[in-house]
Curated annotation (Swiss-Prot):
Role of this protein: Covalently attaches a chromophore to Cys residue(s) of phycobiliproteins.
Keywords for the protein's UniProt record, in alphabetical order: Lyase
Disulfide bonds, paired cysteine numbers: none
Gene3D superfamilies named in the record: 2.40.128.20
The protein, known as: Chromophore lyase CpcS/CpeS
């Protein structure tokens, strides 16, 4: 738990390579599935061309960008065993007068393959909550660090006023070596 963490700190702590294991519950079908993927999160500076382009796409002044990240994923889900891969750029824009809330610009949504802006808020416990409303789907995710190398995520998807899916992910940082015993 990282008390007092803001969005910039959260992005910085998220940078790196992660192994993600997901369990999803499809409530309408009463089915559960699991999946795994490798995530790569690369920090982008506010003057990175991808950050500037995304701000312009949303008619936002790039000077309002707090930071940026490129998130890439490569994984499989149990039900189809096909590769699911892609990437997106994320740019947080703080609400005026707030260090803890704002808009999160996305190059591409996860539930729909179109650009979408969501809302973010940082809790006093260091957890990041993301709310994204697509044309037909409402998505709410909560991400937090159990330790510097273990990130947890819960998410719900709602369609047409009812819950359709709930997920839990554990994400373990890759490439971390144990310190030598003294």
């Amino acid at each position: 738990m990282c008390i007092g963490m803001d969005i910039r700190d959260f992005f910085a702590q998220s940078a790196g390579r992660w192994f993600s294991q997901r369990t999803s519950h499809h409530l309408a079908f009463k089915q559960t599935e699991s999946g795994k993927s490798q995530l790569t999160i690369e920090l982008l500076s506010v003057d990175d061309p991808a950050v500037i382009a995304l701000c312009q796409q949303y008619d936002m002044d790039p000077a309002w960008a707090v930071c940026g990240a490129r998130v890439s994923w490569d994984g499989t889900m149990e039900w189809d065993n096909e590769k699911h891969e892609g990437s997106t750029v994320l740019v947080p824009i703080m609400d005026q007068g707030s260090r803890m809330e704002g808009k999160l610009l996305r190059e591409m949504g996860y539930a729909e393959k179109a650009p979408v802006a969501g809302r973010f808020s940082m809790g006093s416990d260091g957890a990041l909550t993301l709310i994204t409303e697509y044309e037909t789907i409402y998505s709410e995710e909560r991400l937090w660090f159990a330790s510097p190398n273990l990130r947890l995520r819960t998410s719900i998807l709602k369609r047409f006023g009812g819950f359709s899916m709930a997920s839990f992910c554990s994400e373990i940082r890759l490439g971390v070596t144990q310190p030598a015993n003294s």
